[in-house]
Amino acid sequence: YSTIGNQQSKPINALIEKLVNSGDSILTSKVIEAGIDPKDKTRAPQTMKDAMHKYLGVPNGDIYQLTPAKRTALGDECGGVVVTGDNDNPTYAIFDFGEGQAPRDFPKTLCGLSQTNKQQIPFVQGKHCSGGTGALSFVEEGIQLIISRKSPKVNNRQYSDDIGFTVTRKFPAGQRKSPTYKYFIINGEVPSFPAIPLSILPEIGNEQDAFCKDWEYGAFIKLFDYKIGAGLRTSSNIDLSNKLSVHLINPVFPIRFFERRSTSGKAHSSERTMSGLLTRLDTDRSQHIEQDTPYGFSFSVEKQDFTGQIYVLNSSTDRAIWNRFHGNDGVLYIVNGQANAFELNSIYRRKRIGLEYISNRI
């Protein structure tokens, strides 16, 4: 419990780790398909953006350089999120068509805690093989369904071709100090069955049947009754998409959201693509961004080099637009396209900085 319970304090961050894992799986699969060991320091990509450029066709690894049609197509090719359940605590199903895992490897990957299997792969984000379990703290009774199959594109007969599955659950503390989380096994092994197409994917335009399209490999993870929070559970996922874009300013692939809640409103599209904050800034440049921004800068701390960019919203931008872009966040600390820390925009109101008059627009 201490490992799972102490990972993430906010449900949005725990959900992001699932999306990060999907991106890692996609890139890892592409590298292996090219006949390269992901841990090979001479042949494998050394950065995430390099891998995106070489294997996903993303120019310089910048999602915003793709056309809207190509962003949507790339998202559909890689995976997405299906939203079902009710409006209070939606159920999120995260799926991808990446590397996938054989049943025997579940304990050290999809169900693993503090493993080191990713630490030697330079182009992935999730290094510690435990972030995926952080979401369990925000799931009703800790119930999560995991389905995975090793991709035939990377399975060299070293692994089982079966589909593995398990269910996690939270158990009360009882006489223990803390509750425990367990995952389902049979006779000490993750249950499995011979590979067959499973109708567990959404179909574009089909709002009546949430899961009707065949899935064959990769990963499918369903978080039941997820406590995402009042501000992010609205129908059509507009607020959630905006918030995710601040945390994932340049995701490995655009995240496709499929709204399939029966109680959701019909005022907005049931499908949405989240391409990250940098894409939104580029798309809205003519309307809301000061013409000469971003301003680039660089500095060094203890021989470590850092770079940054400063974006300024124009004076006609109102509070609703501020919230859509960055809310109260004034500084984002980014590693591999993911925000790892934030500073509130109140930092610009300090006397020694003296930017109070535009503090909400930086």
Locations of the language-model features?
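Acidic ATP/Mg2+-coordinating residue in the GHKL
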Residues: 96
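GHKL-type ATPase core
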Residues: 121-267
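GHKL/Bergerat-fold ATPase module in large chromosome/replication-associated machines
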Residues: 241-245, 253-362
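Glycine-rich G1-box
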Residues: 99-100
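A short acidic-Thr-Gly-centered motif at the start of a beta-strand
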Residues: 6, 80-88
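Bergerat-fold ATP-binding/catalytic subdomain of histidine kinases
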Residues: 109-124
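Bergerat-fold GHKL ATPase/HATPase_c domain
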Residues: 1-78, 104-111
